[in-house]
UniProtKB/Swiss-Prot annotation:
Superkingdom of the source species: Eukaryota
Family: Belongs to the FPP/GGPP synthase family.
Comment on bound cofactor: Binds 3 Mg(2+) ions per subunit.
The name this protein goes by in its record: Geranylgeranyl pyrophosphate synthase cle6
Residue ranges with Low complexity bias: 1-19
Keyword line: Magnesium, Metal-binding, Transferase
Organism of origin: Aspergillus versicolor
Function according to Swiss-Prot or TrEMBL: Geranylgeranyl pyrophosphate synthase; part of the cluster A that mediates the biosynthesis of chevalone E and its oxidized derivatives that possess a unique five-membered lactone ring and can synergistically enhance the cytotoxicity of doxorubicin (DOX) in breast cancer cells.
Ranges where the record places region Disordered: 1-55
């Protein structure tokens, strides 16, 4: 023990207060163990450098160690590796984009550009941004909603697993962010991108909270949530287009209205449309326990009239049932409370307001948007 203390004291005296800090690393260290170099010499073609050797081949560089060969690929192999990784990471995204769909958002962007007339290069960037965010949101929504089908096919996480699907969706968010930085007014575009994604997640958060806490929102609260959630990508697209355009018209109010129309129409079709049932499953919103627009109306109107249907609806939503008989009974409750009729009237009212807004612009270039509104009309 005495000799140990002596050795330590001796070393300390060599690293004096006047020594440059980095010189301390060169001072003798107590109990320092010397090991042979980690990398062994196997290549006769190169001279030794500090006990290391490197073997070079046309396709790769190999470092030989006691634990095996560690390859470091050259440029061509690195590119191939990156491409393979990209395919793996993006597989859930590519799966969803490969499913049949109407691309309503892409068509909407093209329709708005009929009068904003931004360059094709900028337009394609905006389409990629919105497309990536849309597909990412579908991947996450299907997980959060425990969905089984997407456009008539198994949801992505049923094929790739939940962790890989979440990672792929997150990857798409940052791919979209990198695309935004390619726009001419990239600083302002990045601010818009951030603001709208925050609004989208606030809306989604409230939708999930109401469902999981079994809290029925008011109609006003519901519409505010939809404006944030569903209107987010519509609004992001038009704000970026307006930012890149010399045309000074403000179409954000119209886009907000279109987002609400789109979501209420989707809620209605989830419970009433046979084709929707084939693509997503019969009355999936009931299985999810979601407070969709017709259900909010039925519960609120039933509570006001002291109807037993209101409490029955709440109990059914709590079950998150997949029983078709129970779901058909739920639809009967909605019919009795006039909730489907109320939803149709609301859509007619909103559609008229949207057409009036469109007419105010008085532009022949708005024909494409008129076609979008025609598509959104309910077909009974």
């Amino acid at each position: 023990m005495h000799s140990v203390r002596t050795s330590t004291t001796s070393t300390s005296s060599m690293v004096s207060s006047t020594m440059h800090p980095f010189d301390a690393f060169n001072a003798p260290q107590p109990y320092q163990q010397h090991h042979p170099p980690r990398w062994n010499i196997h290549n006769p073609h190169f001279s030794q450098t500090n006990g290391h050797s490197i073997q070079k081949t046309p396709s790769m560089i190999k470092l030989h160690s006691s634990e095996g060969t560690v390859p470091t690929t050259n440029g061509a192999d690195t590119l191939h590796q990156r491409n393979m990784e990209e395919k793996i990471i993006s597989a859930p995204l590519h799966y969803i984009t490969g499913l049949p769909g109407k691309d309503i958002r892409g068509k909407l962007i093209s329709a708005f550009n009929e009068w904003f007339r931004i360059p094709d290069e900028q337009l394609e960037i905006i389409k990629r941004v919105v497309g990536l965010l849309h597909v990412a949101s579908l991947l996450i929504d299907d997980i959060e909603d425990s969905s089984k089908l997407r456009r008539g096919f198994p949801v992505a996480h049923s094929i790739f697993g939940i962790p890989q699907t979440i990672n792929s969706a997150n990857y798409a968010y940052f791919q979209a962010q990198s695309e935004v930085l390619k726009l001419r007014n990239c600083n302002a575009a990045f601010t818009i991108f951030t603001e709208e994604l925050l609004r989208l997640h606030r809306g989604q958060g409230m939708d999930l909270y109401w469902r999981d806490s079994l809290t029925c929102p008011t109609e006003e609260e519901y519409l505010d949530m939809v404006a944030n959630k569903t209107g987010g990508l519509f609004r992001l697209a038009i704000k970026l287009i307006q930012l890149e355009s010399d045309v000074e018209d403000d179409c954000v109010p119209l886009v907000d209205l279109l987002g609400i129309i789109f979501q209420i129409r989707d809620d209605y079709q989830n419970l009433q449309n046979e084709q929707y049932a084939k693509n997503k499953g019969f009355a999936e919103d009931i299985t999810e326990g979601k407070f969709s627009y017709p259900i909010v109306h039925s519960i609120r109107s039933g509570a006001a009239n002291c109807s037993s249907g209101s409490s029955e609806l709440m109990n059914i939503l709590r079950q998150k049932t997949d029983d078709e008989a129970v779901k058909r009974y739920t639809i009967c409750i909605l019919e009795k409370t006039g909730s489907f009729e109320y939803t149709r009237r609301k859509l007619t009212e909103l559609m008229a307001a949207a057409r009036a807004m469109l007419a105010e612009f008085g532009s022949a270039e708005a024909a494409g948007l008129g076609g979008i509104l025609d598509f959104l009309e309910l077909k009974e």
